[in-house]
């Protein structure tokens, strides 16, 4: 084997070892992303919702800043109810379809049904709520 091939093989092995320490993105978030794109007709990238207001993104506190932020708080609360019922919303996969920009759940029972309902309701809410650029990446220390 050529020395260059050995270096490439070594680099691949080392990078794979390092990648094992990176936590995977929860599986359900891929579905939620697709639901959001279904409902908003792809008009706004999902990352715009990841750091918006006091509730859109990781965690949340205080009073929502507007209708879109209220959608995120409702979604957080919905996931909280699902967790109280023994579900793991960020890891629960479910069956759904997009018909004429309306996400519809096909899952019929248990955690799949409740988590899908949380995501579908939020995706529809996001699509209907106005997006205010001033509320993107706000200082969340003001969220009281």
Swiss-Prot record:
InterPro entries for the chain: PLipase_A2, PLipase_A2_Asp_AS, PLipase_A2_dom, PLipase_A2_dom_sf, PLipase_A2_His_AS
Name any one GO molecular function. Answer: phospholipid binding
Under PROSITE patterns, the record lists: PA2_ASP, PA2_HIS
Q: Supply one GO CC term from the record.
A: extracellular region
**Mind listing the GO biological process terms from this record?**
arachidonate secretion; lipid catabolic process; phospholipid metabolic process
Q: What is this protein called?
A: Acidic phospholipase A2
Q: Which UniProt keywords apply?
A: Calcium, Disulfide bond, Hydrolase, Lipid degradation, Lipid metabolism, Metal-binding, Secreted, Signal
The secretion signal range is 1-19
Query: Which organism is the protein's source?
Result: Aipysurus laevis
Cofactor comment = Binds 1 Ca(2+) ion.
Cystines in this chain: 38-98, 54-143, 56-72, 71-125, 78-118, 87-111, 105-116
Q: Which cofactor does it need?
A: Ca(2+)
- For Ca(2+), which residues are the binding ones? 55, 57, 59, 76
Q: Which reaction does it catalyse?
A: a 1,2-diacyl-sn-glycero-3-phosphocholine + H2O = a 1-acyl-sn-glycero-3-phosphocholine + a fatty acid + H(+)
Query: Which protein family is it in?
Result: Belongs to the phospholipase A2 family. Group I subfamily. D49 sub-subfamily.
Q: Where in the cell is it found?
A: Secreted
Q: Where is the active site?
A: 75, 119
Enzyme Commission identifier(s): 3.1.1.4
Q: Which residues form the propeptide?
A: 20-27
Name any one Pfam family assigned in the record: Phospholip_A2_1
Tell me which tissues or organs this protein is expressed in.
Answer: Expressed by the venom gland.
Role according to the record: PLA2 catalyzes the calcium-dependent hydrolysis of the 2-acyl groups in 3-sn-phosphoglycerides.
Q: Which domain of life is it from?
A: Eukaryota
């Amino acid at each position: 084997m050529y020395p260059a091939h050995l270096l490439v093989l070594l680099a691949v092995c080392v990078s794979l070892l390092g990648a094992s320490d990176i936590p995977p993105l929860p599986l359900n978030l891929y579905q939620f992303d697709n639901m959001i794109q279904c409902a908003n007709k792809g008009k706004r990238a999902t990352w715009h919702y990841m750091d918006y207001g006091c509730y859109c993104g990781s965690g949340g506190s205080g009073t929502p800043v507007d209708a879109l932020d209220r959608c995120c708080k409702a979604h957080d609360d919905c996931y909280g109810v699902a967790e109280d019922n023994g579900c793991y919303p960020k890891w629960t996969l479910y069956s759904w379809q997009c018909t004429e920009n309306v996400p519809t759940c096909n899952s019929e029972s248990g955690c799949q049904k409740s988590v899908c309902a949380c995501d579908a309701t939020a995706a529809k809410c996001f699509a209907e709520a106005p997006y205010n650029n001033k509320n993107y990446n706000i200082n969340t220390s003001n969220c009281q």
